[in-house]
Amino acid sequence: GPAAQARPANEFLGALRFTLLYTFVTTPFILVIGFLLALAVNNVTQRLKGFVISASLLPFIITPVVGALSIKWLFRDNGLVPYILSFAGIKVFWMAQAWSAQLLIIVYGIWHVMPFAFIVFYAGLQSVPQDSLEAATIDGASTWQKLRYVTLPHMMPLVLFVTLIHLMDAYRVFEPVMVLT
């Protein structure tokens, strides 16, 4: 009957709505956090760089199921995050409500994919022409002005690349949805 036909359409529209939400929420976070981390790592000592790069790539190299299970373990009713939040009087049953499960999927998506953006941006920062940065310094440019007028224009093709790759990947998210819901 009509009710049986409406159910698959409603499920499809709900999945489409969440996919669009996931895509448009995770993309800016991945770009901004990845770029800020790349800037930070670009300005630390060589010894610390290796550790930070290795540690930040960990979420990207583990399988999606293991990553989603880790998030599920941290946020389950008796997990670490609810335990810490209980000290502030906050009780959220993360796996019991649709909005909180969706939030966890979004958090997982940012955590899992951001290392890709970070490593692309870090590599891009290595190729920013030093003579352009030195010329800007001689001309009296501040750190912010060098970032805005020298570094960012050089990085824009990489920002577009990471954005397009993530937009394509965002429509293929299955494992975390299956594990976390």
Q: Which stretches of residues belong to each language-model region?
A:
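A structural signal for multi-pass alpha-helical bundles of membrane permease subunits
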Residues: G1-T181
